[in-house]
Every structure is written in structure tokens, then in C-alpha cells.
Amino acid sequence: RWWQAFNTRYNVYFNGAQAYIDGSLEKEKGNKDNFTELIPLYTVGNKNSRDLGKSNFNRAIEKAEKAIAKHSIKKRPEWTKNRRKTDKDIEWLSRREYNPFLWKAWMLMGRSQFHQGAFEEAAATFAYMSRMYKGQTAIYGKARAWLAKCYIEQGWLYDAEDVIRNMQLDSMDWRAVKEWDYTYADYYLHTGELAKAVPYLQKVIKHEMRQKQKARELYLLGQVYAALGKRQDAYEAFQRVIRTNPPYELEFNARIAQTEVMAEGQSKQMISKLRHMAASDNNKEYLDQVYYAMGNIHLANKDTLAAINAYELGRKKTRSGIEKGVLLLHLGDLYWAKERFGNAKKCYDEALGLLDRDRKDYEQLSDRSKILDELAPYTDAVQLQDSLQQLAKCSEKER
């Protein structure tokens, strides 16, 4: 058993673990978050990031499978019949796996499947682990935590709730608590119970060892506080993001978010800060977001005209992406409310090509765009007639 454990650990498993680390770093480096919405706790929650690191994760899975196939020990150890069995002995003899290191290979396989977005395969792996290591509370607890995460990421919240409820009835091993902090945070974020997510997110941030991921989690905490109306807490969370010295895009978005949660009555200070950001050469790529933030502040102050002007400035910037799509959507909504349907149609048509079809408001956007396809020619004709009539009423000098 010792020799099989040694071989598992230092040969096959080591290579698989290294591939897993390489895949995780590739995913972390290439991940692009959509900062206009709550960012996911795990980068695999971003659909566009799922294929990142896939080849490395596949290699990790292959190595884990090889370790399990070559080094599994199913044979029960011999026991002297006249020797009295303790509870510990009974647990030992009831095990289904006697290689003391092999559970790590199972965990490596399941986590690799999870991070490449193969949630059903990962769930099957962790469910099997749960059955195999039922008597070993630490391993069992970790496997159940990951099983719940698989269900959460698939949107199977009732299944996740069932795993969580059953785990609450069992006595949780202290070595599994860390994994469950992540699971609870992810669960409450997906169910929209943001107030319940906060304490677990705070624990997750303390657990996190990777600097960039910690910065993401702090940003997410700031977003949650902002959604709960806790402006000061949100501002401080975004400030903590900046202090971690994260990649520039994350730092920039944290600074933008700070302007949106500053105390009421500080509109001039917020606008001034955003104008200063717009003047910086470092932010040329992100000007659509700067003007979008300005527009939001004007809109909060019920200055619709100033909001439209700010959004229009952002619209003229060359970058095309989700952020610009959200700006165009909001600008189109303002034009729709003002019955300037020709302008609304242009915004909606451009936004349709930039936004994800999974957005909650995408269907409404699509419906409005179809309505305007039929309505816009008539409204344009009416506006032209109104303009001609106004022109006819003017004197020759005014013309």
C-alpha cells in the first residue's frame, strides 16, 4: 500500500497535477469578465472562457485515470479473527479503496472536468467519490461540496439544495469547511440571496491564495454590496481590489464602480473623476465605459438630456463589446421612452449584435427591434413632415 501510494503521488499524479495548474493559469490569464453584470465566482461561469486550458485539463484527467487504473487497491487487508475490532478498525475494513493517496487522483479528475465546463461528468465523478469514501468524513465532505458546485453551475439548484440540506444534517469534518464556504457562496449568488452570500464570500476571500482570483472575488463582493445598497462597503471593497495591484482592466472597472457607489450629493465629484479618467491615455480602450458611467450618474439625478449626451459620446467610441452593447441598450431605452423611434431603432439594431442571447432583457430588446422595423418608416415620415412644417413657418432669414 505504501509503495502504490508513493508511485501514485510522485509519478503519474505529479504530472497530472502540473497539467491542472497550467490549465488553471491559462484560464485565469485569458478570462474576460463582463463587468456590467455580477461576475461569476468561478471563471468557468463565463461561457467564453470555458475552452481555455482545455488541453491541459484533458491531460490532467488522463493522468488521474491512469493513476486510478494502475494503483487502486481493492483487496481488503487480512484480519486476525480473534483480535477485537474497534470502531476505527470497522471503518478501515469497510473501505472500498485502500490506497491512501488515490482520493487525490479522483479529486484531480473531478476538478479538471469541472473547470473545463464538463459539469455532468464532474458530477458523476464526485457522486462516485461520495459513495466510495462515505466513511472518511473529510474526503466525503469535499466530494459533496464539489458535487453541489457542479449542480449549481448547471443551474440545477434544487439538486444542489438537496445535497446542501443533507450535508447540514451530517457532522461536517473541519477539513471540508473551506470547500463548503465556496459552495455556499456560489449557491447564494445563483439563487439571488445576496445578503446570505456576503459572509461566505468574505471567508472565500480569506481562503484564496491566488492574487488575481482574490481581486475578482473582492470585486464581486463590491458588486454584491452595491446591489444591497451598502454603498460605503461597496466602495471599500472596490478600493481593496485596487490595492491588490490587479490587471489593468480589473483595476479600471473597480475605479469606475467606485464612482457609481459614491455617496449621494457627490455627483460633481464623480463626474470630475470620470472626466479625469477619460483624459488619460491608459483608458482610450475603455472610453465607452467611462461615458456610460457618466450617463448613469446623470440619469440618477433625473437629467435625461445629459445622460443621452454622455451615452452618445460613448457610442461614438470604436470598441465593440458587451459593455458598448449595454450602453446602446440603455440609450435605445431612453429614445424609446421619448418616442424618438428612429434613434431607438439604430441603437437596438447595433446592440443586438453585441449582447449575449442569454441576457434576461434580450427578448424584450429583440421584440422592440422587430416592432421598430415596422414602425420606424412611419415615424420618420411624421418627423420629416413636422420638420418641413416648422421650416415653412420660419421667415426667409430664419431658414
Give residue spans per PLM region.
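Acidic, polar-rich low-complexity tracts and alpha-helical solenoid repeat scaffolds
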Residues: 1-399
